[in-house]
Amino acid sequence: MLERAVTYKNNGQINIILNGQKQVLTNAEAEAEYQAALQKNEAKHGILKEIEKEMSALVGMEEMKRNIKEIYAWIFVNQKRAEQGLKVGKQALHMMFKGNPGTGKTTVARLIGKLFFEMNVLSKGHLIEAERADLVGEYIGHTAQKTRDLIKKSLGGILFIDEAYSLARGGEKDFGKEAIDTLVKHMEDKQHEFILILAGYSREMDHFLSLNPGLQSRFPISIDFPDYSVTQLMEIAKRMIDEREYQLSQEAEWKLKDYLMTVKSTTSPIKFSNGRFVRNVIEKSIRAQAMRLLMGDQYLKSDLMTIKSQDLSIKEEASGSA
């Protein structure tokens, strides 16, 4: 029912970009058509409806959300083809996630694990998070064993390696290369038993792939995670505040927006941690509000709920990782 299918580059990589693709229908029209069709088959597609509900809690990322539906559609139709005795491509579902810190990469990985478990693509759907230190050992053979152990824990689920390019930073003699070689071998030997997601900054991930040309073809799905706009960051802040049963005063809201505009314009994108940055500001502001109330003698419901301008933590919070 969706007009736009997943598009492929010449090298077979699924091209999932979250900005500005032309479509036959407008996004609103396509979504309306899609929802109408889904409503007719609600019982059949209950898994997708549940995932969509969880994705609706994520601010922005509209293209990513549509593409998750496309991956669902592709798997679902392949299952129907298999039932009819038609050929079904046994394509691996290993992925690359490219984006700056705090843009939702880990959250989306968890959702994909849940979706694939419900669709019987993965037997467990759990997420194992790892970084260089979890894979690279201290002597010859140690790295391969650590990597194999991590893959074993990931069987039936997703192995999510953050800042994956750090595995290639030490040169030919670095044990990181041994980790890469071990991952590649198991991606082939056990390609339908687990899903490997490599994540990190876009530029570094592209450079990492250029140094390891054989890797790119092994990751058929690549998803870009753009930075949040100030408007989206404010929406994230309001949702965090609401979830905790607080509210921002008008002055606090203005101050936070001005602060986010300043930080966004003066901080390098790779050092700004997006949603995590906002969360840190909100959590510190809640503690500051508690200190302010402790020094006073009023504990009305409105006092306990309101974050005032002076409560806002607006020191430099701009660093963070994936």
Swiss-Prot record:
Task: Write out the entry's keywords from A to Z.
Answer: ATP-binding, Nucleotide-binding, Sporulation
Matching InterPro entries, A to Z?
A: AAA+_ATPase, AAA_lid_6, ATPase_AAA_core, CbxX/CfxQ, CbxX/CfxQ_RuBisCO_ESX, P-loop_NTPase, Spore_V_K
The protein's GO terms of the molecular function aspect are: ATP binding; ATP hydrolysis activity
GO BP terms: sporulation resulting in formation of a cellular spore
Residues bound to ATP are G99, N100, P101, G102, T103, G104, K105, T106
On whether Heme is a keyword of this UniProt record, the answer is no
By its UniProt entry, which SMART domains does this protein fall under? AAA (SM00382)
At the top level of its lineage, which domain of life is listed?
Bacteria
Known CDD domains for this protein? AAA (cd00009)
Report if keyword Heme is assigned: no
- Family membership, please give it: Belongs to the CbxX/CfxQ family.
> How is this protein named in the record?
Stage V sporulation protein K
Q: Recite the lineage of the species.
A: Bacteria, Bacillati, Bacillota, Bacilli, Bacillales
